[in-house]
């Protein structure tokens, strides 16, 4: 993949990630002034995950690092705009949720219950379930870690 193709794919990924970020921000009743920042943060998070995945990291670690970046930027923006960090961060990480792997795991579980046990279906179920669980765990933990680091009152040592 050439540089131009990569940059076009990255721009497309970031633009398409901004749409669900704004949509969920509207569902969560985020103030209108913060909608553009939710879109930008969702784009930054999804774009950084794509860059990390393109550089060779797997989706779990890429999501871990991208959501850490989203949490850190969200805390900084919350100080600038005098809002709670979750105003920016929760809607921004929604585009990184593992819909396809969770859906594939669910379909595999339904097929196992209908057709009976088979090893390929069980492998598909476990692989996709563990991938989805790891991604959701990374997203939930990494939204809280920057707050614990940056708002800590006592010394770290």
UniProtKB/Swiss-Prot annotation:
Signal sequence range: none
Membrane topology reported for the UniProt record: Multi-pass membrane protein
Gene Ontology terms: cellular component: plasma membrane
Disulfide bonds: none
Keywords: Cell inner membrane, Cell membrane, Membrane, Transmembrane, Transmembrane helix, Transport
GO biological process, any: succinate transport
Superkingdom of the source species: Bacteria
Location of the protein in the cell: Cell inner membrane
Entries under Pfam families matching the protein: ThrE_2
Keyword Transcription: no
UniProt family annotation: Belongs to the ThrE exporter (TC 2.A.79) family.
Assembly and interaction partners: The transporter is composed of YjjB and YjjP.
The protein's role, per its UniProt record: Involved in succinate export with YjjP. Both proteins are required for export.
UniProt protein name: Probable succinate transporter subunit YjjB
Annotated source species: Shigella dysenteriae serotype 1 (strain Sd197)
Gene that encodes the chain: yjjB
């Amino acid at each position: 993949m050439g540089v131009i193709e990569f940059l076009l794919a990255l721009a497309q990924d970031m633009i398409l990630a901004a749409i669900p970020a704004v949509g969920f921000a509207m569902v969560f009743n985020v103030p209108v002034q913060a909608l553009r920042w939710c879109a930008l943060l969702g784009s930054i998070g999804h774009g950084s995950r794509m860059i990390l995945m393109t550089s060779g990291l797997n989706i779990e670690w890429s999501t871990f690092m991208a959501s850490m970046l989203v949490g850190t930027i969200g805390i900084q923006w919350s100080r600038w705009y005098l809002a709670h960090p979750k105003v920016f961060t929760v809607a921004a990480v929604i585009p990184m949720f593992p819909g396809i792997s969770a859906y594939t795991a669910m379909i595999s579980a339904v097929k196992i219950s209908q057709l009976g046990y088979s090893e390929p279906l069980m492998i598909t179920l476990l692989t996709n379930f563990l991938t989805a669980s790891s991604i959701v765990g990374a997203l939930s933990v990494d939204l809280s870690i920057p707050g614990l680091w940056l708002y800590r009152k006592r010394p770290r040592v």
